[in-house]
Amino acid sequence: MRLDAVIFGGGATGLWLLDRLSRDGHHVVLLEARSLGAGQTIGSQAILRRSRSSTSSSGLANRVLIVPHGLPSLWRDALLGRITPNLTHTRLRADCCHQWYVESAGLRVASPDNPLRPRFDAETLPPEERPSALADVSGPVVRLPEQVLCPASFIADLAAQYHDRLLKIDAERGLKFHLNSPGEVDAIQLASPFDGQKLELRPRQVIFAADADNARLRRAVGLSEPMQSPRPLHRVLARGRLPLLNGNCVESGRTIVTVISDVDANERTVWQIDGRLAEDGWKRESYQQAERVRQELTRILPGLNLTQAEWSTYELDRAECDADTGPRHDAVSVFCAGNVTTAGPTPFMLAPLVSDEITGRASSPYITTPFDPTPLANWPRPSIAPLPWNEEHRTWWTLGDQPSKDQQQPQRRAA
């Protein structure tokens, strides 16, 4: 089957790119070895942030997420159906975020040189307008014009639009590259993970957008591994009778906690706790990490009742392109060799930028007839990865329990 492009990786970047190339008239399919969104996308905070800076727990100053001015508006327009991709079926967790500030001794929040000073685009809230979870916070509370998406809903939205172009593969036993030379792919031989049926794809361009799996894919086509490093995170989940909250706590210029909340399959409120504690927590066992987070939440959210909450944790090696101590995420990383393009690991909301970068380099479609998915009709399709708190075999506990072996060992998720 001749194609303009084959995409490896069904995360935010791969799906956005699939939409863009398809709309531009390319004959393109996307291959996924696990589930759509598995790894980084499904557990993403999915906050459509504006530019902000923080100091990381590893001591790297000014780690900055630099977001182009028009990118939040692009996402908003897509969610409203004003532009493509049409994301009108993507669910919002919240239409805004909140940020609250913990004052350090001797530091006045109102001081112009104070790193705790609220951002220019933030609306300071009077006590009566604060979310219930922030009612007793002593420092400033601000509202940020940053929407929060449900990544599972985003994936489902695009997957429904391009179902006939999504293929489930067996990357270990059912994938073989035929090369003309290193980095020059002539054909891709697939064997169905269900019944072993064969399929040969002959693309003009091969695109790796598989985050941590890019290294293995590049080796398979004779290329060196990209310059990227795993960033270990140990995230904590809490569920129960919790208030809805989406936002960040800032102390001494550092985002110490990020909370996103949702409702699970049984209508319980779930919090995912991220930030500095997740970066530091990879050294701790699950029960210790959950207890550490509980203590911190009690400190920064006075009045929050966590006595009946259930807890769980998971570890994730989030792939990031290697960088020095300067700004990070200020540009997308795209590497080209032969007819292989590799998209470096990218934060959720920057997926459109990777798409623009790759499509800007792509040749015009060379197949002029309409795309015919008939040869793919009987091929298995990838499912959508469950949200971390909806995983079937996830272990939960209360912090008053004696920790079991499961609670001592974090549940690990591939990046």
Feature map (PLM): residue ranges:
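Short hydrophobic core segments
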Residues: 6-8, 200-213
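Glycine-rich FAD pyrophosphate-binding loop
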Residues: 22-43
